[in-house]
Amino acid sequence: GLLEAHVAAANAVTVITTRLDDPTGYGRVVRGPDGGVEHVVETKAAADATDAERQIREVNGGLYAFDASRLREALERLRPDNAQGELYLPDVLKVLRGDDHGVAAFPVEDPTALLGVNDRVDLARVRELAQRRIHEAHMRAGVTIVDPATTTIDADVQLGRDTVVAPSSFLCGATRAGEDCRIGPLTTLIDAFLGDGVTVPHSYLVECEVHDRAILGPFAYLRPGTVIREGAKVGTFVEVKNSDVGAGAKVPHLTYLGDADVGAQSNIGAGSITANYDGFRKHRTKIGKRVHGGVDNSFVAPVEVGDDAWTAAGSIIVDDVPPGALGIARERQRNVEGYDARKRAEEDGTER
């Protein structure tokens, strides 16, 4: 690489260069009769480079290896003698060459590796190239990316063989997914861990763990500190924060679990929540194994529901439920006959 070549030749400076068909905007590498690098000429302003120099296709890649002591000496001698009135770092090469110090180029064959970024258009172009390389590496390793044009995968993401990434998915940070996962469409994973065989469409996961064969979504939201164990299900419009959902447990729909532990094979009814915040601090809800939760339950933490317990629909659970017991916390329904007629009579003096 650059550093190894620089050290081996004992150069004062070694600069990475490449050749471009259209070198517009790049500093040109000027070589002497012996083929050695003499200096780099900038082309920001018309007066800085001659027409002949502008025809040069070898350009400065913007990466250097310096002898630090030589660099310090050369920097003190730079002058803003250019159309921009600026100090140009590449002028150091001319100073060092004039002092008979070693000045060399390290050519790179692939020019895309050295594309410069001068504006947001350049930034988008470079990002697209980098993303294409990431996609190709994953696909050659056995990952299916259905629509690379709408899929973003960060450089540190790891994906297992036979995993499928559907369109409009964003895999960010240190996300890791095992083999045979189904990710997306419209899914975002940020620093998330997925085991093997996980399915996660239309969902948003941040700093969480999802173990083998778990099923998430659509429209699940997993927040930091969440662990979903093997074969568990977290379904539609479910938000889970700092909670542990046990193996084979089900949280199918319309639920908020915050600071909760749900035991293996338990079922949380639709429309249930854990009330975990008392206005000053958070408290945990502990739900045991094989618990049958009714719909529209509120678990007011701190509270514990024992193994094999049941909770009735519409209950607000504020006290612990013993193992195997049924927790009911609601008023029995009472029907008031003739209510509509009396209400209308009160409002407008009429009955029907």
Task: Show the residue positions of the predicted features.
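Conserved beta-loop-beta/alpha segment of the NTase-like Rossmann-fold superfamily
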Residues: G1-D34, G61, A65-R79
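Generic beta-sheet signal
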Residues: I16-T17, V40, F106, D320
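Catalytic-core segments of class I nucleotidyltransferases/pyrophosphorylases
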Residues: E38-R132, E136
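Long, charged amphipathic helices and adjacent flexible linkers at domain junctions
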Residues: R127-D156, E346
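Structural signal for interior beta-strand "rungs" in well-ordered beta-sheet cores
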Residues: T144-A329, Q333-R334
